């Protein structure tokens, strides 16, 4: 392991949109205030290059927000990091205006983020791509020792930081029934869809028979993937019609509420109101009220496109019945409402079935390349069970944002926040709740596998689900409250005065800062607030 003698003023975990916005706010601060003390910064990113949802960069996919909710406009409209600055630098400003829409394509917004990522580096922000942080410990002289490693070579490096920002992003939420199949070459979360679907279908070309694809989920990603899969299947020769089954637990797909009044829940002012609400019960009620702005819903334009396809199928079937003319061979989309997945098994070319547990090994995953799947589902209203064979399973079940806890609780600095390796659940609370005193909970939790009827989710849970292979006995879960300031700083436990560095969280604080926290809506404003809080420390100590 090598050691870097440089002490960084700020080290960031991750270099996605949240920390790019931080980098942009920092470089603007450097321009405005040459005496600003936070100058030497480093962000550590696991990917080899900047990537933003590459698995969902689908043809014609649109963003769900105005371009004005970019990395900087709501904070500093004349910032060099705005979407308009990007368009101007790319000589597309007039062309974009002529489009007559404030909503860019997902491809263009991804390119904007990549442009901004490079621009902050050009302006002095250091980034280590292809590396990941593996340890955080107390360092000398009021610093944090940060140990990271090269993902490819596994070489480790030790550095020191005066302050730390953790912006880990989300990780795919995997339903229990799919856990054994995560390494299967023809099973994928929507986050990897565009990167994998080509190889999946290429591996099935030799079959020359109708293919059947299952898509699990009822949100925007599930709907987009369903349409894209149908379009791709149309170019694959077959002796019959390919089928795409969209499995949803609801009775129907629901539209997202993007009306002007509902959209105000994503305004920066709503962050203040949410944070100052001194009751978890009330915050949960607000979340439930506005759930249809973001969770398990589909943009009305996408719904219309999907329904038009299904209506066309019904029209073709009716014309065929009346005229006795064969229907077009276009792939068929079937939406299956009130559907719960009970079990999945793989089936070999000879019809033999293989338990999912065997696929957890590399050998099992390799041996499964020519297998299909048998899925048993249950209609949640009638209780009727059915069995269907599939060639590909895609799941758009959202993301969970608690993976950072596993790293953090095993670090040397976790003790300053009352977190230990035995902590199995962290509950984020706003510092406004401290009026009632800190809370610490230990309770018994039944960790037996969940029942089949509740094993699949269309909306990601707020924490990872219990593994279906866990022991069916009660286990003690230690739940620890972790408090955040309005400026996103993790607050040390009561009586803790030995930790001088500040630790900030980004993009995982929906429970404390509201619905917009995991989205792009407030990135620019939030970055400005964090940088201002960092600056206040140095001003107050001057």
Curated annotation (Swiss-Prot):
GO biological process, any: biosynthetic process
EC identifiers of the protein: 1.14.13.196
The organism's place on the tree of life at top rank: Eukaryota
SUPFAM superfamilies hit by this protein: FAD/NAD(P)-binding domain
Binding site for FAD: 45-53, 64, 518-520
Ranges of biased composition (kind: Low complexity): 447-472
The protein's required cofactors: FAD
Pathway: Siderophore biosynthesis
UniProt keywords, alphabetically: FAD, Flavoprotein, Monooxygenase, NADP, Oxidoreductase
Keyword Magnesium among record annotations: no
Region Disordered, residue ranges: 443-472
A GO molecular-function annotation: monooxygenase activity
Residues that bind NADP(+): 218-221, 294-296
Catalytically driven reaction(s): L-ornithine + NADPH + O2 = N(5)-hydroxy-L-ornithine + NADP(+) + H2O; L-ornithine + NADH + O2 = N(5)-hydroxy-L-ornithine + NAD(+) + H2O
Residues the record lists as binding substrate: 69, 263-266, 294, 521
Function summary: L-ornithine N(5)-monooxygenase; part of the gene cluster that mediates the biosynthesis of coprinoferrin, an acylated tripeptide hydroxamate siderophore. The biosynthesis of coprinoferrin depends on the hydroxylation of ornithine to N(5)-hydroxyornithine, catalyzed by the monooxygenase cpf2. The second step, the acylation of N(5)-hydroxy-L-ornithine to yield N(5)-hexanoyl-N(5)-hydroxyl-L-ornithine is catalyzed by a not yet identified acyltransferase.
Family named by the database record: Belongs to the lysine N(6)-hydroxylase/L-ornithine N(5)-oxygenase family.
The protein's name in its UniProt record: L-ornithine N(5)-monooxygenase
């Amino acid at each position: 392991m090598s050691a870097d003698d440089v002490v960084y003023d700020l080290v960031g975990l991750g270099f996605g949109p949240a920390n790019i916005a931080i980098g942009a706010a920092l470089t603007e601060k450097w321009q405005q205030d040459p005496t600003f003390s936070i100058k030497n910064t480093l962000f550590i990113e696991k990917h080899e290059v900047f990537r933003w949802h590459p698995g969902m960069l689908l043809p014609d996919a649109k963003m769900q927000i105005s371009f004005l909710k970019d990395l900087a406009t709501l904070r500093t409209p004349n910032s060099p990091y705005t979407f308009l600055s990007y368009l101007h630098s790319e000589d597309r400003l007039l062309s974009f205006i002529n489009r007559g829409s404030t909503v860019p394509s997902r491809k263009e917004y991804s390119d904007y983020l990549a442009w901004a990522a490079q621009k902050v580096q050009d302006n002095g922000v250091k980034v280590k791509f292809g590396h990941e942080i593996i340890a955080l410990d107390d360092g000398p002289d009021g610093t944090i020792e940060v140990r990271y490693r090269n993902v490819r070579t596994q070489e480790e490096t030790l550095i020191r930081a005066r302050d730390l920002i953790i912006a880990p992003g989300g990780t795919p939420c995997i339903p229990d029934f799919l856990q054994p199949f995560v390494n299967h070459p023809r099973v994928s979360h929507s986050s990897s869809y565009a990167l994998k679907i080509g190889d999946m279908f290429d591996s099935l070309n030799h079959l020359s028979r109708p293919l059947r694809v299952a898509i699990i989920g009822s949100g925007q990603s599930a709907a987009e993937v369903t349409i894209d899969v149908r379009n791709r299947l149309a170019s694959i020769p077959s002796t019959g019609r390919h089928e795409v089954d969209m499995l949803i637990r609801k009775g129907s797909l629901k539209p997202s509420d993007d009306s002007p009044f509902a959209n105000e829940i994503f305004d920066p002012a709503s962050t203040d109101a949410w944070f100052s609400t001194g009751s978890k019960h009330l915050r949960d009620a607000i979340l439930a009220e506005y759930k249809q702005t973001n969770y398990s819903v589909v943009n009305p334009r996408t719904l219309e496109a999907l329904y038009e396809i299904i209506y066309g199928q019904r029209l073709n079937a009716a014309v065929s019945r009346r005229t006795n003319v064969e229907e077009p061979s276009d792939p068929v989309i079937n939406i299956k409402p009130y559907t719960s997945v009970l079990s999945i098994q793989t089936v070999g070319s000879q019809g033999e079935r293989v338990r999912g547990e065997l696929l957890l090994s590399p050998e099992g995953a390799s041996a499964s390349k020519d297998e299909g799947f048998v899925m048993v589902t249950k209609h949640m209203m009638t209780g009727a069970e059915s069995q269907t064979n599939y060639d590909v399973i895609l799941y758009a079940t959202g993301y969970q944002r608690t993976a950072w806890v596993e790293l953090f609780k095993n670090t040397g600095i976790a003790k300053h926040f009352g977190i230990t390796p035995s902590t199995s659940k962290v509950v984020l609370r706003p510092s406004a709740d401290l009026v009632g005193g800190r809370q610490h909970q230990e309770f018994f939790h039944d960790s037996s596998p969940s029942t089949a009827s509740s094993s699949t989710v269309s909306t990601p849970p707020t924490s990872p689900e219990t593994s279906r292979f866990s022991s069916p006995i009660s286990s003690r879960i230690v739940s620890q409250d972790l408090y955040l300031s309005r400026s996103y700083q993790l607050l040390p436990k009561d009586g803790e005065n030995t930790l001088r560095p500040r630790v900030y969280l980004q993009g995982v604080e929906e429970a404390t800062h509201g619905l917009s926290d995991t989205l792009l809506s407030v990135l620019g404003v939030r970055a400005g607030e964090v940088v201002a809080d960092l600056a206040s420390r140095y001003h107050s100590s001057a």
